[in-house]
Structure formats: structure tokens, C-alpha cells
Amino acid sequence: MRRLFAISSTGNRFVHRSLLGKGKCGTAPPSFSHCSFWVRDFSGVRYDYRKISINRLNDLKLDDAVNLFGDMVKSRPFPSIVEFSKLLSAIAKMNKFDLVISLGEQMQNLGISHNLYTYSILINCFCRRSQLSLALAVLAKMMKLGYEPDIVTLNSLLNGFCHGNRISDAVSLVGQMVEMGYQPDSFTFNTLIHGLFRHNRASEAVALVDRMVVKGCQPDLVTYGIVVNGLCKRGDIDLALSLLKKMEQGKIEPGVVIYNTIIDALCNYKNVNDALNLFTEMDNKGIRPNVVTYNSLIRCLCNYGRWSDASRLLSDMIERKINPNVVTFSALIDAFVKEGKLVEAEKLYDEMIKRSIDPDIFTYSSLINGFCMHDRLDEAKHMFELMISKDCFPNVVTYNTLIKGFCKAKRVDEGMELFREMSQRGLVGNTVTYTTLIHGFFQARECDNAQIVFKQMVSDGVLPDIMTYSILLDGLCNNGKVETALVVFEYLQRSKMEPDIYTYNIMIEGMCKAGKVEDGWDLFCSLSLKGVKPNVVTYTTMMSGFCRKGLKEEADALFREMKEEGPLPDSGTYNTLIRAHLRDGDKAASAELIREMRSCRFVGDASTIGLVTNMLHDGRLDKSFLKMLS
């Protein structure tokens, strides 16, 4: 196999003294013919490399740069290595690192010797490709040839260590650089600080800022920006704020980016008032906020339901000629939709269009959700079709929103059509998609179709969650398929998924309504053993089951237990027992329960009042009962 650089077994003293030896410098890197770019002939504009300035090189397109390289290697004599260095540097700035490596190999094969600068470019490219062992091999080769790496080369290697999860080696490299007489610059320190934050070594990163000063390298705006960003991501906002004061004391103006970072962090950690105060502070200091500043604050205010404050900020930024963007409008539209203020959301959408700001998927999805919430399904569908016509393609969340809207409106067949359309577009439905459809079919009394969707969900490899199972069990029980529900419930109990009290309530109610009161009671009694605490619905459901079976004494006993040990009875509990005693002709117990219910500030519900009214007509009750309930 061909080799790009032959490495001597002795190497250079620098390589052997440093951690660079960890990169297996004793092994030459293989040929890079596997790289994804090759020099090809292009029929583009022809360039004379002798007449191209550095500025023009930076303006070259990739195809033209490769074409120019082809012309250079055909020239005799070859252009100087300086000309090749300029071209390789320009291509590296396009982030075409594989191509630079491939061209470097071709230069060597043609006998064009590399110099310090081209070696440095190649090392940087290998580091950017996360091929540290090859970068170290090139470094060893250049040092064997007598080239001492400069600070730029070592910074490239340092960056490679930081991004290659070798942060300890990066720290050691900086220490060895100092020992060997190299003066780390701000890029060195900034790279290492960023790397330390990436590897959760924040205290070392902050301490390094003070070390910079000791080493005669003043932290710059970039340094502080990296540290502030790292601290804010960790939630160390107080430390970030103290660093802000330190900057001002050091006569370094923080700038809008650093303020934005802290304001956004304060918003994320729900310190909205502190964020607004910092916003005022930066404004008073003459640091002009930008659209990013406003977006953070508007989003946060919307999350807190402070619509008027958010709207005022929008007006303020427009007055100051700071143009809101799609993020600004989308945040406000989504917030207004969630608050039920669809008219305001539509006005913002119209304003957005008037300003020639194209809505994104988030904007469209929010409005579709709003239309669905207000049962304006035709408009929701129109908005859905509009976004597709604008080449803004819906994602799973958008589809789920519209499917839910159709299912809620008992138009489940249209929801199913959307589900099929999803598949045709290559989108895979998630747990929410399938659960929504299952619920929709049950609401439409299409029990068989609901079960078919559940089976398809399982066969498609989409895992049902506890909500899916609860909806399935509830639908089966309500459609008289309790035996099927029991089979599903038994499977659920054997699985690793833990049913919640909502699921247990469904099964207890289903059993009781199907006449399996004893089974319902057994399940009720087993809850404490399972570590599940019955709630007021559980107790009321079980009492209702007892009453339906004529077991009034058991219902009363459970009611007493509930008042002593369980959750406090609610209106539903009292009304259930009142009706049971009235049907049984026990007027005294009914009257006592009504008085107790009224003392708890509950009133009779429609079913109880209806029963009392009918019994009044039949002469089985006097009007005093109706007065007690009123």
C-alpha cells in the first residue's frame, strides 16, 4: 500500500518528549486514495495561478479551485510551494478537508516537497476529520525533516484533542508547549477553555481565565463569551453575572452576544424578571439589543402568560427598527393559540405575511392546532394544504395535531386518511399517532377498527404506552368487551409497564358494570399491595358497584373507611350514595347524606335531582328533599 509520509522510528525529540507520541507516530498513515474527493477535469473558467491574488483565491468556487490545481501541476516548472499553500488553504476554508488531503498526496507523488505551512494545513485537516493519529504522524514527519511546528500548528492539534475526547491530552499539551518555550496565544486558551466546558470541567475552565492573565495573555471578548456560554448552559448564572461585572471592570465591553447568552439562560431557568432587568441594564449602557434578545424575552413572557408584556416588546422592537423574524412571530402565535386567543394569533399571522416573513413548520403547526381546538377543521385542513404548497412539509407533530382534531370531531375516517398519507410521505407514526386514532375509533363506537389500529401499532413496532393501554381498556369495557379487556389487562400486568391509578379505575368500573363486583373488589383490595393509592374516583367507582349489586352496607362501610383513611369524598361520592339510599327507600339515610354533602359545600347533580323529581311525581318523596338539594 502506498504511503503518504514515511515516518522514522527515531522521530523528533519534541514528539518523544510530549504526549504526541500517543498518536502512534511510529506508524505511517496509509494512502488517502479512499478520501471522498479526487481531482477531475472541469470545463469551467480557466485561471492563471500567477495572476490570482489571495483575495481572488478566497472567492474561488470549489470546482474552479480543483481546476486551478490541475493547471498548476501541469505547469513546468512547478509553481512555488507558496502558491500551492495558498490554494490548499483556500480549499480548507471551504471545509473540504478530504480534498486537501488528497491534493497533498498528489503533490508528494509528483515530487513537490511540502513546507511548514502545507504540513500545518494537512495537520489541521486531519484534526478536523478527527483523525488524530494521522495528524500526529504528519507532525512527526515534518519535525524529522527539520521543521519546528509553530503555534498555529500546535493550536490545530490542540483543537483536535479537544474535539476528539482527549481533553487530558489537550491540557498536558498546553503545559508542554509552555515548557518548550512556546507562548500560548488567546486562540490556544480559548480552544482549551471551550474543550474543558465540553467535557464538564467547568471549574478548570474558569480558573484558566486567571491563568491567562498570569501568562501575559489578556482574555478577550471571545474568551469571556466561551466562559459565559459554558456557565449558562450549566445553570451557573450567578457566576456568569459576576464574570460580566469583571469584564466591565477590566474595560472589556461585553457586547450584545454575551448579554443575549445570559438573558436567554435567565429565561430558560424561569428568572423572567431578572432577564428583563438585565435587558434594561444593557439598554442603559448603550448596548443595542437585537432580534435574538427580543426573541428570548418574548418566548419567556409567553410561557408565563404575560401576553401584554410580550406584545409590548414586539411593538418596541418594531419602533426601534429591529425587524422581528419567524422565531418572534411563531413564539407569539403559539402562545396565543395555547391561551385560546386564536383571533390574536391570526392577526399576528397576517402581520407576518404582510412583512414577507415566511412561516415555518412551527408557525403552521401552531395555527393548525388553534383551528382544531376551536373546531374549525376545514380551516385547519386548508392551512395544512397551504404549508405543503409552500414547500414546508409537515412533520409527525403536525399530522398528529390534525388527526387529533378530526378524531375529536368524530371524523375519524379523515384522520385515518391523514395517517395513510403520512406513510406515503415516508413519515412513521409514533405512539401519539396510533393512540389518537384508537381513541377516535372508540369515540365513534367503531370498536373493531380501534382494535385493528392497535394490532397494526404493535406489528409496526411502535410501543404502546400506559395511555394507549388505558384508552384501549376503557374502550373495550365501554363497548361490552370486558373479557377482552381482562386479557389485555392481564398481559399489561405481566409486562414491565406499571399501570397507574387511572388504568385501575377503568378496570374496576368495567368489572362492576359487567356484574363482576367481587372481581372489582379483589382488584381494589390489591392496590395497596401494589403500592398504588386509591383516589376519590376509585372509592366512588367501587361504592357505585356495590350499590348497583344491592350491597348497600358494603358501600356505606367503604364510605366510612374513605372518610377515616382515604381521600375526602367529593360531590360524585355523595350523589352516588344518596341515589342508592333513595332507590332503597331509606329516606333518613338519604336526608343525612344530603345535609352532610351541603355542609361540605357540594350540591346535588343532575342525576340526583332528576331522581328526586321523579319520586316527587310518584308521591314517594315530599318537597323537603328538593329544598335540601337546592
Swiss-Prot record:
The lineage of its organism: Eukaryota, Viridiplantae, Streptophyta, Embryophyta, Tracheophyta. SUPFAM superfamilies: HCP-like (SSF81901). It holds the Pfam family PPR_1. Coiled coil: none annotated. PROSITE patterns: PPR. The keyword Repeat applies. It comes from Arabidopsis thaliana. This is Pentatricopeptide repeat-containing protein At1g63130, mitochondrial. GO terms for cellular component: mitochondrion. It is found in: Mitochondrion. PANTHER family: MITOCHONDRIAL GROUP I INTRON SPLICING FACTOR CCM1-RELATED, PENTATRICOPEPTIDE REPEAT-CONTAINING PROTEIN PET309, MITOCHONDRIAL.
